[in-house]
Swiss-Prot record:
GO terms for MF: ATP binding; phosphoribosyl-ATP diphosphatase activity
Originating organism: Listeria monocytogenes serotype 4b (strain CLIP80459)
NCBIfam families assigned: histidine_hisI
Family per record: Belongs to the PRA-PH family.
Compartments where found: Cytoplasm
Keywords: Amino-acid biosynthesis, ATP-binding, Cytoplasm, Histidine biosynthesis, Hydrolase, Nucleotide-binding
Catalytic activity annotation: 1-(5-phospho-beta-D-ribosyl)-ATP + H2O = 1-(5-phospho-beta-D-ribosyl)-5'-AMP + diphosphate + H(+)
Gene: hisE
EC number per UniProt: 3.6.1.31
Main location (coarse class): cytoplasm
Pfam families the UniProt entry points to: PRA-PH (PF01503)
InterPro entries referenced in this protein's UniProt entry, alphabetically: HisE, PRib-ATP_PPHydrolase-like
Record's protein name: Phosphoribosyl-ATP pyrophosphatase
Known pathway: Amino-acid biosynthesis; L-histidine biosynthesis; L-histidine from 5-phospho-alpha-D-ribose 1-diphosphate: step 2/9
Gene Ontology terms describing biological process: L-histidine biosynthetic process
Length: 103
């Protein structure tokens, strides 16, 4: 499903459709896309304190905007998948992850 959505987003970049929100983001450029990613990430944090449906909706929005960002930067989704697979099964401790203790 994410692959299909990513492919559709990439298609909008090369074959714009009038009135498309995705094309609006591409037309406005990287700064607008980054602003939306930041807004949606904040909304995820807030939604996590509320209810499940709101969290699902906000995570979906964030995921979409992250895919737009990847397409804007010409980063294939396969590189993200490869990075996640590379991390699978790796052990780390809180000592290895300084940022955990800083929260």
């Amino acid at each position: 499903m994410l692959n299909d959505l990513y492919e559709e987003i990439k298609l909008r970049k090369t074959q714009p459709r009038e009135g498309s929100y995705t094309n609006y983001l591409f037309d406005k450029g990287l700064d607008k896309i980054l602003k939306k990613v930041g807004e949606e990430a904040t909304e995820v944090v807030i939604a996590a304190k509320n209810n499940e449906q709101e969290l699902i909706a906000e995570v979906s929005d964030l995921t979409y905007h992250l895919l737009v960002l990847l397409a804007e930067q010409n980063i294939p989704l396969s590189k993200i998948q490869a990075e996640l697979q590379n991390r699978e099964g790796k052990l780390s401790t809180t000592r290895d992850r300084k940022e955990i203790n800083d929260l």
